[in-house]
Swiss-Prot record:
SUPFAM superfamilies found in the cross-reference section: Ribosomal protein L6
Keyword set includes rRNA-binding: yes
InterPro entries on file: Ribosomal_uL6-like, Ribosomal_uL6-like_a/b-dom_sf, Ribosomal_uL6_a/b-dom, Ribosomal_uL6_bac-type, Ribosomal_uL6_CS
Name the UniProt record assigns to this protein: Large ribosomal subunit protein uL6
Gene name for this UniProt entry: rplF
Biological role stated in the UniProt entry: This protein binds to the 23S rRNA, and is important in its secondary structure. It is located near the subunit interface in the base of the L7/L12 stalk, and near the tRNA binding site of the peptidyltransferase center.
PROSITE patterns assigned to the protein according to its UniProt record, in alphabetical order: RIBOSOMAL_L6_1
Organism annotation: Flavobacterium psychrophilum (strain ATCC 49511 / DSM 21280 / CIP 103535 / JIP02/86)
Example GO molecular function: rRNA binding
Key words, A-Z: Ribonucleoprotein, Ribosomal protein, RNA-binding, rRNA-binding
Protein family (similarity comment): Belongs to the universal ribosomal protein uL6 family.
Length: 181
């Protein structure tokens, strides 16, 4: 049995889970998420828990068993508590500001990068004197949050020599030694 898939998902107070025609719908105080699943797995709601089971024991079905259990668990956690990612802008003159859902990034290019953020993601920029600017993203949808954060990081990935670029807070960069004289 899948080590991840066999664990039931506890449903916290204030969260409802519905299963209809291979679609799981999770509703909570922060929002609503839906997920389709294949007929290789079955999803049941019993006694305040979500149980994911698989029909057979092939390699693909074992993988999907753990996958759908993890996706549903992320949905339940997202609508109850939410997820947060913080990006740090490391570099001279790197700045971030926001006007509503528009993120304005100055990352050393000739023009600023203006990015429209999805309405499901809340955006906050923190700029303190003497510290690197931080972009804080919060959402109930973990997949969308990771996609938006990866897109922002992709504008200027951290380089290995000086560490300049956009990185996640707490991310450890593999640094290289410069050329020796």
């Amino acid at each position: 049995m899948s080590r991840i898939g066999k664990n039931p998902i506890a449903i916290p107070a204030g969260v409802t889970v519905e299963v209809n025609n291979s679609i799981v719908t999770v509703k909570g105080k922060l929002g609503q998420l839906t997920q389709n699943y294949t007929n290789n797995v079955t999803v049941k709601v019993e006694e305040g828990q979500v149980i994911v089971e698989r029909a057979a024991d092939s390699k693909q079905e074992r993988a999907q068993h753990g996958l759908y259990r993890a996706l549903i668990n992320n949905m339940v956690a997202g609508v109850s508590t939410g997820f947060t990612k913080e990006l740090e802008l490391v570099g001279v003159g790197y700045r971030a500001s926001n006007q509503g859902q528009k993120l304005d990034l100055a990352l050393g290019f000739s023009h600023n990068i203006v990015l429209e953020i999805a309405s499901e993601v809340t955006l906050e920029t923190i700029s303190e004197k003497g510290k690197n600017p931080i972009v804080k993203l919060t959402s109930f949808d973990k997949q969308l949050l990771g996609q938006v954060a990866a897109k922002i990081r992709g504008f200027r990935k951290p380089e290995p020599y000086k560490g300049k670029g956009v990185k996640f807070v707490g991310e450890v960069l593999r640094r290289k030694a410069g050329k020796s004289a």
